Amino acid sequence: MKKTNIVGAQNVEVSIKLPSEKTPQEQLAIMEEYTRVHKESKGLSKEKREINCLKVIYPTLFRSIEEQDLLAGRLDFLPIGFGCVTSLGGVGHYCVFDKLLKFREELSLVEDQKRVDEMYSYWEENDVKALYCKDVLTEDTVGRFIDCDFPLMATARLSGMMLDYPKLLDNGIEGLKTLIKEKQVVLGDNEFFTASIESLELYQQVVDFERELVQKAMLQVSPERRKQLEMMDNDLEVVRSQKPRTFHQALQMV
């Protein structure tokens, strides 16, 4: 097994990320809470641990509606969190170590820098990609991403999941809950089914949060812009529980 070097570029950035709306202190608090919940959920199932952690970052990390937006859903990604692809945060429970070090430089208090150091040490042993690399890297054939000294990059195609878009759009959130509950009756309850229901309920909490942001954005806008925001708000209300009926609603849902 090759010793993993976690310092350096870990992800492919497909676009330049906007600076977080949260202050450095707010970001630090969110990442600490995520780390705490992840640590305290160690003895739980992976499903329960995941939903516990997701509740820390959602809907907290969703951004305000901007003037040009026609859909709600802008989202911040911090150096520590949960993701589905390497280009946005990371895969699974992640820590982007180089970004965490850059974030550390934004903090002026030594006490705050030490808080970052503690998280860094924890995620060295818990970041999904770091754990994966420890298992698959070799001394001379398999390197980590990005390492051109090796013929094979272990994490070049590492990704977390792909949505079943037809099932999502054909059933809607409440429809998906019904499908899961039907499976529970046939197969019996388990942690996966329970966490799946909780994740759909969390989605609905996010929609409620987004509607608040949209309604806040309606203050002091032109009549034309108000119509756009009203459609956004109405579509969010629909997809909170029903399957989308228009293309715009489908876009908003996913």
Task: Identify the meaning behind each predicted range.
Residues M1-E182:
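Long, non-catalytic protein-protein interaction scaffolds
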Residues N171-V254:
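Structured, charged N-terminal subsegments at the starts of enzyme catalytic cores
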